[in-house]
Each structure stands twice: as structure tokens, then as C-alpha cells.
């Protein structure tokens, strides 16, 4: 493979990532959509290690089966030892948050996780990271939501997270690869598409460029802070647990950020889902502003149920209630 130009840049990037995060004898998988980002990643990955390509067919477009089969054949031609089409079904209702996009993403990660035989390479780029940060800012769900995607979140690997989207596109051109153009990427009914096509270009124009890189740097800094607070929360937890609950007095002694991180982890371990910063702070008031108030409702993984975080006899507890 030509080591010059975009292909060479991608190869060096993936080699450096593998040297940092992957065992030397790891085989790996790559999630391939057929688009330029994942196609270029597949081309490079297959030259470096034994690679299995997984193409997830969500069945959301009339030609999705044909697109998936084309991508499968491309993967084999690029040197993958195996390439499989994995079919998933996305049925409404799509859930309370994120709609169709979130449901498709959840199904995709689930089927990739169930079929993988090693780390899974994902082709998210620096531009994807910037879009993710902006989405998190819009939701206002706390620092974690704007900390972006981790480069390495086992089994998920994102070796291109520091690379602009233009590089894999150029690599496909260098390799003579015909990448699939996902119509969703130009459909402005989707929030991420509008961010990509309208918001980010406007920010680049108004702020004089460098916005994508700046957003990604912000995500990295916040992610480092978030991971440190996670460590402090894990260290504090053994002295706070009261069976399946939490001692309110011991919680109150913790720094604010650490206390709320403990509460977040406790809620998630108890089956909470779709947590917002507002909900976590609401539960926090059961510790810091206790006046005998009622519990705080949060989403549950159980259909038709929600969880109620309450305080009884100085202990935070969780119980289920019908929606």
C-alpha cells in the first residue's frame, strides 16, 4: 500500500493507536458502513492485522441490503479475512431520547458487541467528535455529555478520532474506492446533519476557523477531568454504601462533583437510564437540601416502570413505580 498522502497518514495513525491500546497479537474487527470514513479505515486495518469486517444493515432504506452486500465485497477485496452482514430491526417506538438515530445506534453497538472476535474499530473522526460535543452542549446534560467519545473504550476503538474527515475521503480517492453516500448525511431532518452542514460551517466563519479542533480539545480536557472524578467517586463508595442504598450524611461530606458522580453511578447500577444533569442534581438535593421532600423520578430499563430515588432514615433508596 502506498504510504504517501492520505493513505500513509491513516496507516501511521492506526499503527500508533494499535501500539498504544491493542495487544500485539490482537486480531480486530472493523465496523464498515461503506462510507468513506469506514472504508478507508478498513483498507488500512486489513493491511496491518487480521481483520473481520462487520456491516450492519439497519433495514432503514430500500436499498440497504444491496449497500451492505457491496460493502461486504469491498472488504474482502481490501484484504479482510472475513466480512459479514449483520441485520438488525429497528421498531418504533424508538425511545424517549434520540429517536431513530439513537435506536439505530443502540442496535448497531449491540449486534457488533455480540459478534465481535476482538477489538472493534470505529471510524469516528475529529469532525464527528466536534458534532458530538455540540450535541452535548445543546442537551445541557453536564460535563460528561460534552466530553465526547473516548479513543479507547473497550471493546470500542476509535483510531481516527484525531483525524479530519477530509483525510479518509482523500484516502478513498487515492485507493480508487467508490464510497457509499449515506442520504441521511444530507437530510436536514436530523439534528447531527444540521450541525454538520449548517452550524459548524457558520461557527468556523464567525470565529475564524479552528472550531472543530477547539471543540475536540475541549472534549479531551473534560474527559480527563471526568475520569479523575470517577476515580475519586469509586474510592469514596465503600464508605457510603448502606446495603443497596447510600448514607446521606457520608455523601454530604464529599465535594460536590464527587458526590454527584457517586449518585450517578448508584442510579445507573440500580437500573436507571437516560439520566440528565437535572435529575442527578434533583437527587442531590435529597442530601444537601433535605426538608422531608418526596422522591425524584428517573427513567428505568424496565418497560412501563420508572425508578424513584427517595430518602428514608438518612439513607437514599431506589424503588420501582409504574409510569
Swiss-Prot record:
Transmembrane segments: none annotated. The keyword tRNA processing applies. SUPFAM superfamilies: Adenine nucleotide alpha hydrolases-like, MesJ substrate recognition domain-like. Coiled coil: none annotated. It catalyses: cytidine(34) in tRNA(Ile2) + L-lysine + ATP = lysidine(34) in tRNA(Ile2) + AMP + diphosphate + H(+). It comes from the Bacteria. InterPro entries: Rossmann-like_a/b/a_fold, TilS/TtcA_N, tRNA_Ile_lys_synt, tRNA_Ile_lys_synt_N, tRNA_Ile_lys_synt_subst-bd. ATP binds at residues 33-38. Its EC number is 6.3.4.19. The keyword rRNA processing does not apply. Keywords: ATP-binding, Cytoplasm, Ligase, Nucleotide-binding, tRNA processing. Pfam families: ATP_bind_3, TilS. Its main location: cytoplasm. GO terms for molecular function: ATP binding; tRNA(Ile)-lysidine synthase activity. GO terms for biological process: tRNA modification. The N-terminal region contains the highly conserved SGGXDS motif, predicted to be a P-loop motif involved in ATP binding. Belongs to the tRNA(Ile)-lysidine synthase family. This is tRNA(Ile)-lysidine synthase.
Amino acid at each position: 500500500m502506498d504510504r504517501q498522502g492520505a493513505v500513509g497518514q491513516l496507516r501511521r495513525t492506526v499503527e500508533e493507536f494499535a501500539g498504544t491500546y491493542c495487544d500485539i497479537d490482537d486480531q480486530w474487527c472493523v465496523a464498515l458502513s461503506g462510507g468513506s470514513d469506514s472504508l478507508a479505515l478498513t483498507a488500512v486495518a486489513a493491511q496491518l492485522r487480521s481483520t473481520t469486517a462487520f456491516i450492519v444493515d439497519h433495514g432503514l432504506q430500500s436499498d440497504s441490503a444491496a449497500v451492505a452486500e457491496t460493502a461486504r465485497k469491498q472488504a474482502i477485496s481490501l484484504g479482510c479475512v472475513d466480512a459479514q452482514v449483520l441485520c438488525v430491526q429497528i421498531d418504533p417506538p424508538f425511545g424517549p431520547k434520540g429517536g431513530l438515530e439513537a435506536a439505530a445506534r443502540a442496535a448497531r453497538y449491540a449486534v457488533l458487541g455480540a459478534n465481535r472476535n476482538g477489538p472493534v474499530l470505529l471510524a469516528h473522526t475529529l469532525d464527528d467528535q466536534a458534532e458530538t460535543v455540540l450535541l452535548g452542549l445543546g442537551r445541557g446534560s453536564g460535563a460528561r455529555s460534552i466530553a465526547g467519545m473516548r479513543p479507547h473504550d473497550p471493546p470500542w476503538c476509535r483510531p481516527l478520532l484525531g483525524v479530519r474527515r477530509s483525510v479518509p475521503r482523500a484516502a478513498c480517492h487515492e485507493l480508487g474506492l467508490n464510497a457509499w453516500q449515506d442520504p441521511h448525511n444530507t437530510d436536514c431532518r436530523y439534528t447531527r446533519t444540521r450541525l454538520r452542514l449548517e452550524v459548524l460551517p457558520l461557527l468556523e466563519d464567525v470565529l475564524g476557523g479552528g472550531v472543530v479542533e477547539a471543540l475536540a480539545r475541549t472534549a479531551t480536557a473534560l474527559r480527563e477531568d471526568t475520569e479523575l472524578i470517577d476515580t475519586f467517586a469509586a474510592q469514596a463508595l465503600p464508605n457510603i454504601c448502606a446495603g443497596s442504598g447510600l448514607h446521606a450524611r457520608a455523601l454530604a461530606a464529599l465535594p460536590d462533583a464527587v458526590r454527584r458522580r457517586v449518585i450517578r453511578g448508584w442510579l445507573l447500577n440500580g437500573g436507571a437510564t437516560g439520566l440528565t444533569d437535572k435529575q442527578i442534581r434533583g437527587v442531590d438535593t435529597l442530601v444537601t437540601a433535605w426538608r422531608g421532600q418526596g422522591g425524584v423520578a428517573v427513567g428505568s430499563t424496565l418497560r412501563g416502570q420508572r425508578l424513584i430515588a427517595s430518602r428514608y432514615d438518612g439513607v437514599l433508596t431506589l424503588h420501582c413505580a409504574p409510569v
